[in-house]
Swiss-Prot record:
Binding, UDP-alpha-D-glucose: 346, 348, 363, 366, 368, 371, 387-388
Tissue and organ expression note: Expressed in seedlings and roots.
PANTHER family attached to this UniProt entry: UDP-GLYCOSYLTRANSFERASE 72E1 (PTHR48046), UDP-GLYCOSYLTRANSFERASE 72E2-RELATED (PTHR48046:SF5)
Gene (UniProt): UGT72E2
Protein name (database record): UDP-glycosyltransferase 72E2
Organism listed in the record: Arabidopsis thaliana (Mouse-ear cress)
Amino acid sequence: MHITKPHAAMFSSPGMGHVIPVIELGKRLSANNGFHVTVFVLETDAASAQSKFLNSTGVDIVKLPSPDIYGLVDPDDHVVTKIGVIMRAAVPALRSKIAAMHQKPTALIVDLFGTDALCLAKEFNMLSYVFIPTNARFLGVSIYYPNLDKDIKEEHTVQRNPLAIPGCEPVRFEDTLDAYLVPDEPVYRDFVRHGLAYPKADGILVNTWEEMEPKSLKSLLNPKLLGRVARVPVYPIGPLCRPIQSSETDHPVLDWLNEQPNESVLYISFGSGGCLSAKQLTELAWGLEQSQQRFVWVVRPPVDGSCCSEYVSANGGGTEDNTPEYLPEGFVSRTSDRGFVVPSWAPQAEILSHRAVGGFLTHCGWSSTLESVVGGVPMIAWPLFAEQNMNAALLSDELGIAVRLDDPKEDISRWKIEALVRKVMTEKEGEAMRRKVKKLRDSAEMSLSIDGGGLAHESLCRVTKECQRFLERVVDLSRGA
């Protein structure tokens, strides 16, 4: 039995916002750390963008049939509950695929919603890791909150007091995870279940770095603070986001940006699954028009239900010719000299790295946040769901690289949007944020440095050594050593 390199099996939950970070981690393990990587993804009806992305990854992709969850969840269930049911139902198919592999994996890496598959690590004698594609703050809250007494939880969720987290900034009631506010709902049990499962792995990989989250990361690495709850090694491996491929990307928005002045364009996007209501969409359009600033706006159809209702089905691609119908009458023609409206999808990483882009109105999804930081672009924070409120607090209050809507769940006025756009794009506060985010961009490059021994590189080297030692023990045992 001659095996020269470890084999990582990776299991991603559905949604491009989850698939992309898992794939990028796999590519990094393969290219920089000598792993053979197999990524398991769920088949989806989403066609063009995800299929194109998966076909260009350079790692082995194995598609699992997407389970039929009809009758297992209610239509109104939270997206996290739906994802959890899907992932749990997919474990038997994953087990069968791993069992049929000629070279059994050395390690199983699941993402934040894949903890039901951790049992397979023991079954097939693999190391196990949880990959948190979001940040250290989310990880800290996730593992700490389930261990609190009921009275302490109610001080936060009922009395609305800030939640104290060891070594970290307190979490305001307004920024807490929505799931914690509904303890009788399945989504609450899902978050608690996952949070309790993370420390049961052999290690936790988190998509951040020291300068991005100094307090939260220091606490997780300190055995007297959050490290006491984590119990296993925490590996900061960020920033992990899709690399920029401008030379390979053909999209008319990039041609339009080439004609604009430096740092003059505001980019607006709410991710692959975030949607606004019709009223919010209208107010945003009027706010943009009144600001008189250049913009690129990725528009998705409005929804009147959950702001994350499109998440599981979002495919990150395609066009819809009737997109202007969602906007105020005459908006496109009135702003045609300074605006570019894109139906449904645009090459975000390439846009945020473009010299013409000077601001980003974002839902604060972590992948989008990292792409903005890597591009050196300050933000307007409009969080919608999940941990995005905590992300917005980090960006605006701790790092000073974003301005934030006061309460996006309340009515949003066009005048507030206009003021925030002007603040970021034309005023001194925006210039100060731009300087800060460019310093963070430089620290991100240092974290990824191979020659300079950056934190992300060193963390993955530690994981590699652990897997290599484990593989050697397995080989020795198979030889009867």
